[in-house]
Amino acid sequence: MRKKFGIIVALIALTTLLSGCTEINEPITPNSDGIWNTIFVYPVSWLITNVAGVFNEGYGLAIIIVTLFVRLLLMPLNVKQIKSSKAMQEIQPKLQEIQKKYTSKDANTQQKLQQETMELFQKNGVNPLAGCLPILVQMPIFVAMYHAIMRTPEISTHSFLWFQLGSPDYILPILTGLFTFLQQKLMMSTNTSMNSNPQMKLQMQIMLYVMPIMIGVMAFFFPAALALYWVTGNIFMVFQTLLINKPMMAKK
């Protein structure tokens, strides 16, 4: 678990290093320097711009279409991540039994703990690091989407539905928070490991309310184009979670 956490932290640091060297207010163009701009940001910006051109400069619709396209592209990785998480949840009771069995901190006991833990993983076909690959792939893409939307000048000059894409909106942040809450609530409904772990249950319940509020508040201060991206992504995730969890919820 620590190794997995370390990988995620390293990825966040790498993504921050790649994207942090670029001013978020600097427009993205074909001539923008750096690997981050060339490989990640500009291709997304180019795609949004060209899709908008198909729909008579409809940048709002283009953001929705590109967001759904990216989410569909990454859906197999999301499914893999969720299945890996469910597999880990199912073996949690046995894993806790092993941990209670070897409470001593001496080297010999810790070696036995590690050995039995690995045997449990192998017996149940669980790879504790399997959930890292989807995160490794997805995070740079999502950050690139953020940069592309914020740094494509044409987006801010257009409107969509009732809002100006370049200015903050007051309805989209509420929708963003609402669908973030729904998505997390659906994920929690099939998390069986929480019942045997009160501490984890408390943490998840806190995050259930804190995360939507944080994202909703952030959306109030960003251009509506970014909030539209978040709302679209969150709605997709709600339907994806329902689709993946449907067999599991039916069993209950």
Swiss-Prot record:
GO-annotated molecular function: membrane insertase activity
PROSITE patterns linked to this entry: PROKAR_LIPOPROTEIN (PS51257)
Covalent lipid sites (N-palmitoyl cysteine): C21
Compartments (UniProt record): Cell membrane
Topology term for the membrane: Multi-pass membrane protein
Signal peptide span: 1-20
GO terms, biological process: protein insertion into membrane; protein transport
Classification via Pfam families: 60KD_IMP
Residue ranges of the TM segments: 59-79, 129-149, 160-180, 206-226, 228-248
Annotated lipid attachment (S-diacylglycerol cysteine): C21
Keyword Nucleotide-binding: no
GO CC annotations on file: plasma membrane
Keywords linked to the UniProt accession: Cell membrane, Chaperone, Lipoprotein, Membrane, Palmitate, Protein transport, Signal, Transmembrane, Transmembrane helix, Transport
Function per UniProt: Required for the insertion and/or proper folding and/or complex formation of integral membrane proteins into the membrane. Involved in integration of membrane proteins that insert both dependently and independently of the Sec translocase complex, as well as at least some lipoproteins.
Family: Belongs to the OXA1/ALB3/YidC family. Type 2 subfamily.
Protein name: Membrane protein insertase YidC
Species annotation: Oceanobacillus iheyensis (strain DSM 14371 / CIP 107618 / JCM 11309 / KCTC 3954 / HTE831)
